[in-house]
Amino acid sequence: MGVLLGIAGLTVPLSVALGSGTAQAASACTAKAGPYQKQAEKFLGRPVDGKQSAADCRAIRSFQTAHAISPNIGYAGPITRNMMDLVGKQRAAGKNPNKAKKCPTNRGRIACVDLSRQLSWVQDGKKLVYGPVPVRTGRNGHETRTGSKKVYWRNINHWSTLYHVRMPYSQFFDGGQAFHAISGNVWSAPGSHGCVNMRTADAKKYWSLLRNGDDTFVYGRKPGT
């Protein structure tokens, strides 16, 4: 069940993809085709002609809204294209996120973090236990540090005295860097201050799966860092 929930969370619901509601109403829809119009049309399952239609714009704008891209006016620019590329890689991970075998499989239970794809999952040996789920890691200048780590401190209701924000379900694995829930969008730019930001349901699941002393392995490089 955990694996299926994690993978399902990578797909934007059809109702969002088609677009309606207050978030969409907040901004106008552009009639101008962007430089990545065809790529956006293909990604969203629209007719690929490179021309902006009202339906194309609604679909692009809905994707932008769901992934915290601003302005969300339906223009297929480079930020939207890059996000579609990232989400495509996340979806492609499917039930085998460790296909490249970059996260160790000889340590028992371990939380893996792929910075390049902005994905995390928990595995036990070669068995996928939960995920993969989308995460938001450290921005340029505050990169999430790579390598082998261990969970060393957990605080379910942590409050950051440095950034003055709530960090629910915090599980620290490297200095001040931790897995924790955020109230915002995990796809939003530019990234965290080094922590692995998660949706609340995913952070809660990690809390139930991991314990002090459990391994964590971080690898890759976040786009834009």
Predicted features by range, described:
Residues Q37, E41, C57-I60, R81, ...:
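Extracytoplasmic/secreted envelope proteins and their assembly/folding machinery
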Residues M1-A25:
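Secretory targeting and sorting signals
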Residues A26-V87:
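Short acidic, glycine/serine/threonine-rich helix-capping segments at coil-helix boundaries
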Residues A76, T80, G88, R117, ...:
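A mature extracytoplasmic/lumenal domain signature
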Residues K95-G108, H142-S148, W153-T225:
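Exported/periplasmic cell-wall-interacting domains
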Residues N98-G141:
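A structural motif detector for short, solvent-exposed N-terminal "entry" segments of globular domains
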Residues G88-N96:
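Low-complexity, Ser/Pro/Thr/Glu/Lys-rich regulatory segments of predominantly eukaryotic nuclear proteins
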Residues A28-T30, R58, K102-P104, V113, ...:
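Sequence contexts marking disulfide-bonded cysteines in secreted/extracellular proteins
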